[in-house]
């Protein structure tokens, strides 16, 4: 059954219902943003019906007293304070300002054209005077790729922030919108850059390739957008490429991303015949003219061969909206044609409610149809006042409070990105409430340290513009603020904190040291800086091997940092063989009764612990429980037991890797009046853990990577052979016009150097992405090899 048939069936089933019954209670026009790394909350049932042109009318009753009352309600009863009420009580001048602000990110699969699209946005908004392409073909490179490495490799490594103004025609007059924009990397190794950008943004543009459609990293980005409840519009890029099929991409958005999507444009021509688009809401043809497509020409005349497609897609747009918006559903039932204003209002409501994404089309590289996408950002993505942001009140046992984007209220902001510059540490801050002013003091909610703000700047890639203050809903950067990524700042009047972004665990490690010992100081500086900037870049010193170990999201991730150390700090490094982040887990339930007794005169050690260890049933973590009755072990010694359990889990008995999926229960024990201590019980627990663990037939777990490979169809057999050689589990294959895609779960251990083999097998035309999927029991032969290697290394160290 087709999507349209299902939709019509649903609408017919509503035909007998009274209109009032179709309107859910508790409508909410605005998206609900929970500032946490928790999974997606439920989507609001339906939007309100307040017309757009009335939402921002000046309210004469606004005053500082009103703002204070709103703040009080936001703290005491956040669930009763709607975003509409916040907007209606806003100062008229402030309402006018914030209604024209958009905080957006551009995200996509690698090589979908994010940076190229951003370059056109900056050019058409007048932010830059000339367009430069990625890879630095003209020895300049794209504006947002400010690092030499980015321009050389043609990839984005760090998210880059900028701002621009877009003048849009509304009802015959020009309206200026202020856009804060963040361009993000597409490579999975730099996923933290996407996480922290989406954490503080109100909306996003999801870019898809017209040929490839939804790809592996598109699915990852979609998951990240859902994690932070970010509404999005979609832009199908590369419409001029051979094999482009935008409607297949829209179908994939519906099916693979499980998101209602419909075109708001149709192309005029495809591939090398692509000339422009038809706006199917207003039924106008749109073309770009001028050397770089800077002139937008609208025509009422739609090409005869395109009109039937435009009319059919307009009908499909209305049907899709009827499925997610009550107003359009009512018009559909009454067989009335919605007006342009009604359609745009419905698209905006459904987009902000995250039940729908409007799909635009164009070619950034060919300078076609980028400006209509800019109009879509203004029309359909929310302003900061339309997104609900929550914080935690530390004075009220971390009760949830709503942040109110009024400039007059006490300041609350979140540091979401750190960067080293020539002038010191640069801290990017999103202002959620109040105003951040130069020269004022702010307080770090994590450590309650007071910090003076010496300089505030607005960033334009690697350039900056000094400002004296930044209002609610804006993004800026400050100098001289010592903090960590994810810290909350206030002006001291409120004791609020905001939860940080989701940080994935590293999957690959390698040893590193400077080739020349005189470079140790710079080596340490670089390591410390990179750790502050990137939460997924981890460093620790292995006391047994006496090596510095760096960990990250993939080979490319660590290679980039090694190269940055050479370029930015002039430190050449030697690196060891990449190490896989294996894990260990218990095999079966085992009981233990362990006594630690050392009494040789003077203070001794005495601790007895008894209980059992067993699998938890999942690999999310480990559990420690005490079921002591009769006080055989005192409370303070039980804390020591729990600490010993944690230390034992940090370094497993099999090969020294972390333990997962293990529960330890202590239900009995004994103490000595003088010889028992916290140290004794900590050591006894660790010893009991090791013995019980080894008796349980334990397993080594290896990380399996979700791997997606795309290559020309003629190389399919060679690629499958490469995967079979690595014992990969092939989950699915898709065959396109001239290329194929393989989805597989691969052992990370078998994927080192895979890019070289793939290039050789596909004449350099194949590409692949990997991201962590899950842990699986390692094959028996691999477990034996790893244990033998570990024991050999341990024996060698003990000989020294």
UniProtKB/Swiss-Prot annotation:
Q: Which SMART domains match?
A: EFG_C, EFG_IV
The tr-type G domain covers which part of the protein? 99-385
In the record, what terms sit under GO molecular function? GTP binding; GTPase activity; translation elongation factor activity
Q: Please cite one Gene Ontology biological process associated with this protein.
A: mitochondrial translational elongation
**Where is GTP bound in this sequence?**
108-115, 183-187, 237-240
UniProtKB keywords: Elongation factor, GTP-binding, Mitochondrion, Nucleotide-binding, Protein biosynthesis, Transit peptide
- GO cellular component terms given for this protein: mitochondrion
- Pathway, per UniProt? Protein biosynthesis; polypeptide chain elongation
Point out the transit peptide region. 1-34
Stored SUPFAM superfamilies: EF-G C-terminal domain-like, P-loop containing nucleoside triphosphate hydrolases, Ribosomal protein S5 domain 2-like, Translation proteins
Concerning Gene3D superfamilies, the annotation shows:
3.30.230.10, 3.30.70.240, Elongation Factor G (Translational Gtpase), domain 3, P-loop containing nucleotide triphosphate hydrolases, Translation factors
Compartment list: Mitochondrion
User: What function does the entry list?
Assistant: Mitochondrial GTPase that catalyzes the GTP-dependent ribosomal translocation step during translation elongation. During this step, the ribosome changes from the pre-translocational (PRE) to the post-translocational (POST) state as the newly formed A-site-bound peptidyl-tRNA and P-site-bound deacylated tRNA move to the P and E sites, respectively. Catalyzes the coordinated movement of the two tRNA molecules, the mRNA and conformational changes in the ribosome.
Similarity comment: Belongs to the TRAFAC class translation factor GTPase superfamily. Classic translation factor GTPase family. EF-G/EF-2 subfamily.
* NCBIfam families per the UniProt record, alphabetical: EF-G, PRK12740.1-5, small_GTP
Name assigned to this protein: Elongation factor G, mitochondrial
Q: Which gene encodes it?
A: MEF1
């Amino acid at each position: 059954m087709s999507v349209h048939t299902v939709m019509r069936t649903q609408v017919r089933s509503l035909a007998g219902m009274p209109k009032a019954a179709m309107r859910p209670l508790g409508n909410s026009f605005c998206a609900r943003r929970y500032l946490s790394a928790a999974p997606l909350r439920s989507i609001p049932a339906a939007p309100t019906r307040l017309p757009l042109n009335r939402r921002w009318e000046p309210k004469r009753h606004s005053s500082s007293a009103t703002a204070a009352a709103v703040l009080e309600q936001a703290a005491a009863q956040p669930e009763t304070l709607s975003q509409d009420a916040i907007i209606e009580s806003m100062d008229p001048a402030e309402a006018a300002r914030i209604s024209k602000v958009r905080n957006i990110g551009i995200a996509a699969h690698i090589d979908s054209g994010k940076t190229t699209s951003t370059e056109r946005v900056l050019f058409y908004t007048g932010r830059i005077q000339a367009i430069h392409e990625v890879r630095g073909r003209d020895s300049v490179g794209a504006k947002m790729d400010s690092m030499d490495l980015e321009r050389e490799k043609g990839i984005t490594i760090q998210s880059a922030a900028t701002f621009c103004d877009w003048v849009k025609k509304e009802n015959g007059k020009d309206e200026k919108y202020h856009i804060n924009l963040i361009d993000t990397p597409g490579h999975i190794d730099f996923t933290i850059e996407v996480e922290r950008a989406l954490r503080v943004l109100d909306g996003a543009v999801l870019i898809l390739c017209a040929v490839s459609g939804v790809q592996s990293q598109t699915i990852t980005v979609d998951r990240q957008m859902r994690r932070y409840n970010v509404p999005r519009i979609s832009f199908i890029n590369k419409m001029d490429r051979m094999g482009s099929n935008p409607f297949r991409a829209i179908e994939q958005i519906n099916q693979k991303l499980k998101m209602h999507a419909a075109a708001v444009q149709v192309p005029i021509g495809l591939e090398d015949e692509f000339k422009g688009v038809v706006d199917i809401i207003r039924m106008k043809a749109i073309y770009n003219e001028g050397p770089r497509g800077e002139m937008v020409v609208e025509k009422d005349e739609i090409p005869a061969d395109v009109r039937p497609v435009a009319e059919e897609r307009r009908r499909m747009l209305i049907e899709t909206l009827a499925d997610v918006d009550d107003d359009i559903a009512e018009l559909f039932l009454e067989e009335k044609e919605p007006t342009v204003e009604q359609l745009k209002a419905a698209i905006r409501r459904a987009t902000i409610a995250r039940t729908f994404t409007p799909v635009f089309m164009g070619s950034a590289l060919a300078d076609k149809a980028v400006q209509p996408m800019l109009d879509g950002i203004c029309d359909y993505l929310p302003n900061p006042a339309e997104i609900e942001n929550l914080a935690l009140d530390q004075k009220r046992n971390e009760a949830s409070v709503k942040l109110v984007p009024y400039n007059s209220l006490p300041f609350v902001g979140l540091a979401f990105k750190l960067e080293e510059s020539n002038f010191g540490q640069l801290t990017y801050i999103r202002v959620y409430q109040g105003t951040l002013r130069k020269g004022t003091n702010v307080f770090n909610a994590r450590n309650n340290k007071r910090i003076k703000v010496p300089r505030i700047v607005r960033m334009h890639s690697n350039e900056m513009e000094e400002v004296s203050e930044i209002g609610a809903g804006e993004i800026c950067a400050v100098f001289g603020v010592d903090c960590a990524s994810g810290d909350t700042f206030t002006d001291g009047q409120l004791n609020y904190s905001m939860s940080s972004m989701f940080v994935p665990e590293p999957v690959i490690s390698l040893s590193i040291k400077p080739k020349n010992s005189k470079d140790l100081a710079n080596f340490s500086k670089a390591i410390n800086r990179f750790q502050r900037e990137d939460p997924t870049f981890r460093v620790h010193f292995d006391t047994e091997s006496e090596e510095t170990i760096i960990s990250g999201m993939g080979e490319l991730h660590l290679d980039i940092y090694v190269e940055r150390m050479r370029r930015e700090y002039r430190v050449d490094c030697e690196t060891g063989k990449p190490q896989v982040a294996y894990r260990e887990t218990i095999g079966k339930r085992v009981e233990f009764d362990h006594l630690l007794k050392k009494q040789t005169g003077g203070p001794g050690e005495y601790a007895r612990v008894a209980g059992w260890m067993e699998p938890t049933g999942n690999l999310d973590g480990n559990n420690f429980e005490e079921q002591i009755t009769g006080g055989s072990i005192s409370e303070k010694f039980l804390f020591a037991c729990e600490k010993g359990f944690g230390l034992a889990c940090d370094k497993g008995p099999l090969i020294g890797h972390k333990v997962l999926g293990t529960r330890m229960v202590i239900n009995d024990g004994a103490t000595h009046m003088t010889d028992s201590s916290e140290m004794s019980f900590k050591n006894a627990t660790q010893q009991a853990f090791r013995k019980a663990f080894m008796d349980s037939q334990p397993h080594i777990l290896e990380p399996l990577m979700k791997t997606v490979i795309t290559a020309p169809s003629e190389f399919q057999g060679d690629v499958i052979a490469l995967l079979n050689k690595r014992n990969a589990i092939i989950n699915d294959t898709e065959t396109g016009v001239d290329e194929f895609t393989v989805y597989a779960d691969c052992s990370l251990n078998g994927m080192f150097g895979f890019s070289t083999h793939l290039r050789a097998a596909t004449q350099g035309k194949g590409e692949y992405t990997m991201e962590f999927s899950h842990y699986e029991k390692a094959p028996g032969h691999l477990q034996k090899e790893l244990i033998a290697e570990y024991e050999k290394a341990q024996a060698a160290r003990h000989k020294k």
